[in-house]
Amino acid sequence: MRTDDILKIAETIDNAGYYSLECWGGATFDVCMRFLRENPWERLRQIKKVCRKTPLQMLFRGQNILGYKHYPDDIVDRFTALACENGMDIFRVFDALNDPRNLEKAISCVKRYGGHAQGTLCYTTSPVHTVESFVRLAKVQEAMGVDSLCIKDMAGILTPGAARELVGALKKALPKMPIQVHSHMTSGMAAAMYMAAVEAGAGCVDCAISSLSSFSSQPPTESVVSILESEGYDCGLDRAALTKINAYFKDLKAKRQPASSAKVEPVDAGVLVHAIPGGMISNLRSQLAQQDALDRLPDVLEELPKTRADLGYPPLVTPTSQIVGVQSVLNVLAGKRYQMVTDETRRYAAGYYGRTPAPIEPKLQKKLVGKLKPVTCRPADLLEPGLVAAADALPPNTIKAEEDILSYALFPEVALGYFKWRNADPKTREPIPADLEASASSPSPAAHPTPAGASGSAAKGDATFLSQEETKGTPVLAPLNGTFYRSDALGKPKMAEDGAAVKAGQAVCVVEAMKLFNPITAPAAGKITFLVEHGKAVTKGQPIAAIA
């Protein structure tokens, strides 16, 4: 959805009587530059010009800001300041692991610059996620100074009974704290759950206009309003405005919706078993399709809860949903669990993302962590300031405003691509990709640029390549369809030089697949010769190097 699409209906939305309008943050920032060729900061400014009555709200991933890794405190601070200056009002601050250490800096910055800091409880179910544990977390966030609390039910698994119990416990423990509830219609329960939450004391619920609602979206605004008003609650919304808003987006949706999305079932009761958010299932389908293994989706859905339990029951929200999801896919495709482990899984197990809700079994943790040094402090304490370095790394002719430096600090390759396009002063923008939904659901946390063709479709190798039989020496095979890289991060040296002696088990290259890096180890000792150029697409089973 382009900014122009939003602005055409923004005044009507502003006059409808909403408590707030979520319009920024999360994946939208990345998508603006990557796919829409728009400046996300300008989008915020334009919406604020029109929406003067309704507070604007954003999704803020704590120390991850809007990205998929932790950022230094100076970047968190300056990003928050500029977001407030450009019109943001309410910051929903959350951490995928519910680790308070990853929230404190973001919350303090929001408060310092005059924003409304909304704390968040990422809701999930597990032996360690209890009402008592959520109340304890809420009290910690209250002590940090949050202005309100959100119960964030990413998968749509919060039942009416559980909502009544949780909201009731929160209101009892924190009687003055406003409670907001966010859910998805994946399981079909969210509207009923909202009613129970409101009866227990919640003052606000998240909805989507009916033409954009349901399944992995929110419950329909009009229906929830009718339910609440039938029970004597006054929502204060203008029904005529809602009708106009719905008609507008219904027409826009018909023009923009990919034909494939019409095939999605309106309710997935399976989420009550596997607890996987709807958007994550879409991403799993996309990842398996890239590996020509879509028929293995049932196996992955069965494996994922086991992997999640192994990794300490993290809530399935960005970035942990991507880490757990890809590791589950690898466990299925490799035929043996944890035979292949992504760098992100290793870093997660070592504590680089924060404290896991439950401890990882020591033997498995040792295997996953490998040679990484475990992190016991707040992960961001290990990071050097990054704002000056980001500014120095940008060519001067690409910077038009300070916001550009922040965009680059968060998404280096995506921002550079956008700046290059912007400097070319194009007369028209590219059409919005038809496979945008699948490709944008979990953008890459990787340090390499995403290669053309790697988004939304299987990466294909060269038309011809050496077979295992033609390869001299012991072949190093690509374990997945993806993109071959000689280094494990942008700007880093090659992991192994041509002709160098390598040891068995030594990491010699990576294959980027499913938007995460997969280290490839030498199957034998000897001298290595690479058969594929850096940055080229490869297919599963293709020899990428030989050891003699």
Feature-to-residue mapping (PLM):
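Glycine-rich phosphate-binding active-site loops on the catalytic face of alpha/beta enzymes
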Residues: 93, 153, 200-217
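Catalytic cores of alpha/beta
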Residues: 129-141, 187-203
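Acidic, low-complexity mobile loops and tails
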Residues: 450-511, 519-527, 531, 540, ...
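C-terminal helical cap(s) of enzyme catalytic domains, especially alpha/beta-barrels
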Residues: 213-235
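Conserved, mostly hydrophobic/aromatic
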Residues: 13, 93, 149, 201, ...
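Terminal or standalone catalytic/regulatory effector modules within metabolic enzymes
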Residues: 15-32, 263-270, 275-463
